[in-house]
Regions:
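Mid-domain alpha/beta scaffold segments of enzyme catalytic cores
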Residues: 1-276
Length: 276
C-alpha cells in the first residue's frame, strides 16, 4: 500500500460559502467506496469532481465512475511515468493510444490527462514521454476535449511541445509547480493553472506569487487526492473535500474573499470541462 493511503483521514473542513469542483483527483486510489468520499466532499462545498486515469485500467475505471455518478467527470490518459510500460504491454503503443482515444470520445470524459513529461523520475525515457505527449495532444484535439498536463521538472519542453504540436482549446497544468515567470508564460498562451495542496505549504511562497500573477479566468483548484494533503491536514489522507483548504489559500493569495474565489473557480471549470 502507498504511504499516502496508510495515513489517517483528515477532519472535514469548514464548508465553503459556495460550491466548487475538485479539478483533479484519483477516486480509484481512495480507500473505500466512492459514495462516502463524494458525500464528504459535498458537505465541504466540493460538489463536483474530476477523476483522472493514469493507464488504461484506471482510465476505464474513471470513465465508468463518471457514467455512474452525476457529480463526477473523467480524464483519461497514460501518465508519462507509465508510457514505457504501456508501450511494452499488450497492444503496444498504437493499441493503447487507440483505447485512450475511444475512451476520450465518451461524453462523460471531459479531458485527456494526465499526460505530459516527468523528468524527476526515470520510469520512462524522455524521448518516449515526448512521443506519447504529442500523441495525447492529438487525441485531445480530435475529441474536442481539454488537455490535462503533468509537468514535473520539464517546463521548457512541455511548453515547446505544446507550441510545436498546436495546443487544444483548453490546456490545464495540473498541480502547477512553476514559479511566477512560468505562470506568466502559461498565461500568455491562455493555459489554465490548477493549484493543489502544495499552494498551502509554508515552503511555497513562489507558488502563491504565481497564483497571484495570472488572470482570474485561468485558475482552478484540485486535490490530487489521495496525495498532497493541504495544510492544515498535512500528514493525513487527502480527499476531494480538502480542496476547500486550497480554495481559501488561493483566495488569500489573490487578496479576495472565499465566496468570490468560489465563483471564479466554478465558472472556469465549466468553461474548461463543460457543465456537469
Amino acid at each position: 500500500m502507498s504511504a499516502a493511503l496508510s495515513r489517517p483521514p483528515a477532519p472535514d473542513p469548514e464548508p465553503l460559502p459556495a460550491t466548487v469542483p475538485d479539478s483533479h483527483c484519483h477516486l480509484d486510489m481512495m480507500v473505500g467506496p466512492v459514495g462516502p468520499v463524494l458525500a464528504q466532499a459535498a458537505r465541504s462545498g466540493i460538489s463536483r469532481v474530476v477523476t483522472v486515469g493514469c493507464d488504461v485500467p484506471s482510465s476505464q475505471w474513471a470513465a465508468d465512475c463518471a457514467a455512474e455518478h452525476g457529480s463526477v467527470i473523467a480524464a483519461v490518459a497514460i501518465h508519462p511515468n507509465e508510457t514505457a510500460a504501456a508501450a511494452a504491454g499488450p497492444g503496444g503503443r498504437d493499441g493503447v493510444l487507440a483505447q485512450i482515444a475511444d475512451l476520450a470520445a465518451q461524453p462523460r470524459v471531459r479531458a485527456v490527462g494526465e499526460t505530459g513529461l516527468d523528468y524527476y523520475r526515470d520510469s520512462a525515457p524522455p524521448e518516449v514521454q515526448r512521443d506519447w505527449f504529442r500523441a495525447h495532444i492529438d487525441i485531445a484535439k480530435a475529441a474536442g476535449k481539454a488537455l490535462m498536463i503533468h509537468d514535473r521538472d520539464a517546463h521548457d519542453d512541455v511548453l515547446a511541445i505544446l507550441a510545436q504540436r498546436g495546443a487544444p482549446e483548453h490546456v490545464i497544468f495540473h498541480c502547477f509547480s512553476g514559479d511566477e515567470a512560468m505562470a506568466r508564460r502559461c498565461a500568455e498562451a491562455g493555459y489554465v493553472l490548477s493549484f493543489a495542496g502544495t499552494l498551502t505549504f509554508a515552503s511555497a511562497p513562489g507558488l502563491r506569487a504565481a497564483a497571484a500573477a495570472v488572470p482570474p479566468e485561468l485558475l482552478l483548484v484540485e486535490t490530487d487526492a489521495p496525495f498532497l494533503a493541504p495544510v492544515p491536514a498535512r500528514g493525513k489522507l487527502n480527499a476531494p473535500a480538502l480542496a476547500a483548504h486550497t480554495l481559501r489559500a488561493l483566495a488569500a493569495a489573490r487578496g479576495i474573499d472565499a465566496a468570490a474565489m468560489c465563483e471564479i473557480v466554478s465558472r472556469n471549470a465549466e468553461r474548461v470541462f463543460g457543465a456537469w
